[in-house]
From Swiss-Prot:
Family indicated by similarity: Belongs to the UPF0178 family.
Protein name: UPF0178 protein TDE_2151
Organism: Treponema denticola (strain ATCC 35405 / DSM 14222 / CIP 103919 / JCM 8153 / KCTC 15104)
Record-linked InterPro entries: UPF0178
Pfam family, one: DUF188
Length: 155
């Protein structure tokens, strides 16, 4: 299992928590972005071409079923969920086959509103509550994934 991070807009504290979890569980953590981003010790940084969606494409092409991805990008999350990855965002939301289409529809609707000048003001704060929610979800998801991998290897 590898942990993939869409690093273009990933907050520093989330990068730190993710790298620490990877180190603790001896899992590779790969940050991908179209520019150099400082990453914590022990993690890898892949700098892709400086083109739109290049980091997303890299993660999609190199990840495998059972890996974990962290991204805010809903279309990327959809691709990865469909591929069989565990996918979460930096606020502690998990994307699944059951809910990803709802998130994608909401995202597309908000883009339509924005294009027509009707979008509400963004009030998304990012603080201790969101960091704690992310950290808790990351820990529980990694434990679940590793337990499943252990069970699968016994048969």
């Amino acid at each position: 299992m590898k942990i993939w991070v869409d690093a273009d807009s990933c907050p520093v504290r989330i990068r730190q928590i993710t790298a620490k979890a990877g180190e603790r569980l001896k899992l590779p953590v790969i940050f991908a972005a179209n520019r150099e981003i400082p990453v914590p010790k022990g993690a890898s940084m892949v700098v892709t071409e400086n083109t739109e969606q290049a980091a997303d494409l890299y993660i999609t092409e190199n990840s495998v079923e059972g890996d974990l991805a962290i991204t805010r990008d809903i279309p990327l999350a959809k691709l990865l969920v469909d591929k069989g990855l565990y996918v979460i965002n930096d606020r502690g939301t998990i994307f699944t086959r059951d809910n990803i289409n709802t998130y994608l529809s909401a995202r597309n609707f908000m883009y339509e509103l924005q294009a027509n000048g009707l979008a509400p003001e963004k009030t998304n704060s990012f603080g201790k509550k969101e960091i704690q929610k992310f950290s808790n979800l990351l820990d529980s998801l990694l434990a679940k994934a590793l337990k499943q991998r252990h069970l699968d290897s016994r048969f």
